Regions:
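M16 family metallopeptidases and their MPP-like homologs
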Residues: 45, 50-67, 74-75, 92-142, ...
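Positively charged n-region of N-terminal signal peptides that target proteins for export
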Residues: 1-4
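Hydrophobic, small-residue-rich alpha-helical packing segments that form membrane-like cores
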Residues: 153-208, 212-221, 225-227, 232-240, ...
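Internal metal/ion-chelating core segments
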Residues: 200-239, 671-676, 681-713, 721-723
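Flexible helix-coil linker/hinge segments at domain or subdomain boundaries
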Residues: 150, 248-252, 374-381, 633, ...
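Proteolytic maturation boundary segments
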Residues: 19-41, 231-296, 300-305, 310-315, ...
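Active-site His/Glu-centered metal-binding helix of metallohydrolases
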Residues: 74-82, 310, 568
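Hydrophobic h-region of N-terminal signal peptides that target proteins for export
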Residues: 10-18
Length: 932
């Protein structure tokens, strides 16, 4: 909410609303905010989504920007050390205790460091026992002021940080780091990048880390946030007691706030990288921030809303431009927000098409000048006002079912950024008052003030390739000046179509009703053969999720047609529906909170969607059109091909592409049905074949099962009428399909593909995969496979990350699939120092064989069972989970609601050992390793 005073009109509007004086915004009465004498701030809120769970966060208003040169990277290093020994939790004690009650490291126990903040969290902590709550608060206390920073733990973590640096050392990060000194000369923001310097990481003295900790970690820079199913009064007293003896941070200096200098003339910054895959053109118009005392006032709120509307109108223009084949970019957007702690910016970005970099820059200049010169039309403004009001209305309707973690994030942003937290009721009422007062002339004046020559930074990040031509610094400035004298067509008013379907189809009937008691779901069979399943919930007051599936997918598509099939749903979504282009359709949906999207996968076709209660019929109409009226649009197809050609032009510059392609070829044993989307495959695609495939896959709605989950009542007559009309009115036939066995299998036997690639950062990328086709698809087998992946993840965390410091992390997962035939699969993937590759690969297999020979450790098995059961309990309060439960029930005949808990409880060390042994003894294992 840190905005500058844009115009006297906006200021006058703000003041008129506030009796000639900017008024502070209220804080939601459900949030208790307090501050202790030592400077510690706290936020406490009772919230029951999910029930019997709570969020415990500590926000530190310090980050990498505060490091000295010899501490470069140590703010982030310190964050890691918070999990390696504290006053009350020795060693890995925090992780060990909370994982024993189902709170997982990584997912629920985590932290992040940025330039200006460091935030730690314990998420979805059970509140069923007071001892757990006390332990969580004790962790907050230790993270605030009780880190041990033992020398052996510091040394052990150096390797982990090195590997995190290696994992992130890719083209985009290198260019970001290289361009900041050019954009922000002399600023602290030009010097710091969070991950830091490996020379510092490898060699810093222990006291360098301790000095940063002692200087900046203190109660005046910290806020404790507790949100969930807790007693607010009790938590407040516990916080006061725990922090009673924590001293204020005295004689260590105020936390400085750094900025970036103003510039009278444009700054032009250009960097290139050998592995970059696209050109990013960015224009930053720096603006002074609103003074701190005004940031949480009604004046700031009005200005923020006005700026959001302006950016949204500009983005709508860019979106419409992107639908044209002659568009010079593959992606574009703008936003207004905090650039650094003491400066805001309006930022506009183009991702240029290959070979059109100069044209893209000129077009960006033209669009900005068009906004500056003419502003926007009344119809453009009315569109974004409708969207804005619909968003606030949905938030208001769902104010009673906001999840704990989202409420915690609101408090964190209030503390760190002065973001307001007045509550959805206040905001919805206020926005309804403000929007009518924001006229097009006022917003056009704001738009004009956004685009200026002073305080402008123009930057280009591009591939190091002779075919990528960029303007020089001088040419970039010349083009900026020239655009002001060019003729630019003014925008024109447009009428917005509102009806998606002019004539509704003849409604069908509900011929059969079946209630599935175990799922609390109602199943209808309609007169046209369509099957509908309705699951009412109360988890979200204004959310309805929609999903439909049918068997078939790519497995029923001829091999020669797969390139076109891969584009089929993109072609339809970009082509529009019925007589509406995609742009017309987008405008017709203005102000509606609805989405529908078709998809085709290897063995299924599906439609997914969501809507508010009042937009449910619109969602059904969109689904109706996706089945009945996909639109052939040559122009949109050429737009798609142009975008894809540009995206693929530099695809192979990234060595990770060679690695992922190699993995995919192993997964399919070099089948000619392998879809690796490259230029050669794109050249084989055609518009007509793509539409033919789409129409074939969605030819018979009676072959689909349609699901509705959310705030929907199957007994509601209006809902029944909508379903009978838009689903029951679909034309169907008697043809029912099953997915075919496309004969695609993983490479059999023991296979190894080791190869080298040129790369900027020397990295060994590794993929290991075990597959068995000898295991039937059952819930027990699937959960034993999942358990194997979970337990091995823990083993690799301890052996490869913590003991060896060899990798930032090993991605590990295991599961079962039904198609094309039942099979079980275990994958492990990681990056490491090439010098350590062989040793770590051996550890990967050793951990597997240890379980095969001895079974899993009891502590690993028990904590993962606890975690799975805890996750299950939490998932039962999510609409998305129920949608998944229903689809699995109808696809695979497995009832998670009745069977999952018992199946998890029945997992034993013996069942895990036997399952993994069977997987390994199948004898199908491949390794893909890419070396520099």
């Amino acid at each position: 909410m840190k905005k500058f005073i844009l115009s006297t009109l906006v200021l006058a509007l703000s003041l008129s609303m506030a009796a000639q004086q900017p008024q502070p915004l209220p804080i939601d009465s459900a949030v208790r905010v307090g501050k202790l004498d030592n400077g510690l701030t706290y936020y406490i809120r009772h919230n029951e989504y999910p029930k019997q769970r709570a969020e415990f966060h500590i926000a530190q208003a310090v980050g990498a920007i505060l490091e000295e040169d010899h501490q470069n990277g140590l703010a982030h290093f310190l964050e890691h050390m918070a999990f390696n020994g504290t006053e009350h939790f020795a060693g890995k004690g925090i992780i060990e205790y909370f994982e024993s009650i189902g709170v997982n490291f990584g997912g629920n126990i985590n932290a992040y460091t940025s330039l200006d903040e460091t935030v730690y969290r314990l998420s979805e902590v059970p509140t069923v026992r007071e001892g757990i709550i006390d332990s969580a608060l004790l962790v907050m206390h230790d993270w605030a002021c009780g880190l041990l920073l033992l020398e052996d733990e510091i040394d052990a973590e150096r390797g982990v940080i090195r590997e995190e640096w290696r994992t992130g050392a890719q083209a985009n990060r290198r260019m970001w780091k290289a361009i900041n000194p050019l954009k922000y000369p002399g600023s602290q923001y030009a010097k710091r990048d969070v991950i830091g310097d490996t020379a510092v990481i490898n060699n810093f003295t222990y006291d360098a880390l301790r000095d940063y900790y002692k200087k900046w970690y203190g109660p005046d820079n910290q806020a404790i946030i507790v949100v969930g199913d807790i007693d607010v009064d009790q938590i407040e007293q516990k916080i006061k007691a725990l922090w009673a003896d924590v001293p204020a941070r005295a004689n260590r200096g105020e936390r400085p706030l750094y900025s970036v200098d103003d510039n009278a003339e444009p700054i032009v910054a250009i960097v290139r990288d050998k592995e970059a895959q696209y050109t990013r053109i960015e224009m930053e118009f720096k603006k002074p921030q609103l003074p701190k005392q005004f940031r949480c006032t009604d004046m700031a709120y009005v200005q923020s809303l006005a700026l959001d509307l302006v950016c949204e109108m500009f983005n709508n223009r860019l979106s419409e431009l992107s639908m044209k084949p002659e568009a010079t970019f593959v992606g574009a957007g703008s936003y207004y927000g905090e650039l650094v702690k003491e400066k805001d910016a309006f930022v506009a970005i183009y991702l240029a098409k290959q070979g059109q970099e100069v044209a893209a820059y000129k077009d960006l200049l033209t669009q900005l000048e068009k906004m500056r010169r003419y502003g926007f039309t009344t119809s453009e403004l009315e569109r974004v006002k409708k969207e804005c009001l619909a968003a606030y209305e949905k938030a208001y309707n769902e104010r009673g079912t906001v999840r704990n973690i989202n409420r915690a994030q609101e408090c964190i942003r209030h503390y760190l950024d002065d973001s307001p937290i007045p509550g959805e009721e206040w905001e919805y009422q206020m926005v309804q008052q403000i929007l009518p007062m924001l006229g097009v002339d006022m917003l056009n004046q704001i738009a004009q003030n956004l685009v200026t020559d002073e305080n402008l930074i123009i930057s280009f990040q591009a591939p190091e390739d002779k075919s990528v031509v960029l303007p020089t610094e001088a040419e970039a400035v010349e083009m900026l000046a020239a655009v002001k004298n060019e003729e630019i067509e003014a925008p024109v008013e447009e009428a917005i179509r509102e009806n998606l379907v002019e004539t509704a189809p003849k409604a069908g009937k509900i011929k059969k009703t079946n209630y599935i008691e175990s799922l609390g779901a109602t199943e209808w069979t309609l007169s046209n053969g369509v099957r509908v399943v309705v699951k009412p919930t109360t988890f979200k007051q204004d959310e309805i999720l929609f999903y439909a599936f049918s068997q078939g997918g790519y497995s029923l598509v001829a091999t020669a047609d797969l390139p076109s099939a891969a584009l089929a749903t993109d072609v339809v979504e970009l082509g529009g529906l019925a007589d509406m282009s995609a742009t017309d359709l987008q405008k017709a949906l203005t102000g509606k909170r609805v989405s529908v999207s078709p998809s085709i996968s290897a063995y299924n076709e599906s439609v997914s969607g969501s809507s508010t209660i009042k937009d449910l019929e619109t969602m059904l109409q969109l689904n109706y059109l996706y089945f009945t009226a996909p639109r052939r649009d040559e122009e949109s197809y050429q737009t798609l091909i142009s975008i894809l050609n540009s995206q693929l032009a530099n695809r192979d510059k990234n060595p990770k592409v060679a690695f992922s392609d190699s993995v995919q070829m192993m997964q399919t044993d070099h089948s000619d049905r392998t879809i690796i989307f490259n230029k050669a495959m794109l050249d084989k695609a055609s518009l007509d074949k793509a539409l033919e495939v789409y129409k074939a896959r969605f030819a018979n709605p009676a072959d689909f099962t349609f699901f509705f989950v959310g705030n929907v009542d199957p007994n509601d007559e209006v809902f029944q009428t909508q379903v009978r009309t838009w689903l029951g009115g679909l034309k169907t036939n008697k043809k029912l399909e099953k997915a075919a066995d496309d004969k695609v299998r993983v490479a059999m036997g023991i296979q190894k593909n080791y190869f080298t690639r040129q790369m900027e950062t020397k990295t060994a990328s590794n993929r290991i995969q075990y597959t068995s086709y000898d295991m039937p698809y059952t819930l027990a087998n699937d959960l034993n496979m999942e358990m194997i992946g979970r337990i091995l993840s823990t083993r690799y965390l301890e052996s490869i990350r913590e003991r060896e410091g060899g990798s930032y992390g090993v991605g590990c997962a295991a599961w079962m699939n039904r198609h094309p035939v039942p099979y079980a699969q275990l994958i492990m993937q990681f990056d490491t120092d090439p010098e350590k590759q062989e040793k770590l690969m051996n550890i990967i297999h050793e951990e597997v064989m240890t379980i095969v020979e001895n079974g899993p450790l009891a502590k690993d098995l028990n904590k993962e069972k606890e975690s799975m059961l805890k996750d299950f309990q939490e998932d039962l309060e999510k609409n998305s989970y129920w949608k998944s439960v229903l689809s699995i029930y109808y696809k695979n005949g497995i009832n998670y609601i009745t069977d999952y808990k018992a199946a998890v409880e029945n997992i034993t060390a013996e069942s895990v050992q036997a399952t993994l042994k069977k997987l390994v003894e199948a004898g199908n294992m491949f390794e893909v390793v890419m070396l520099p």
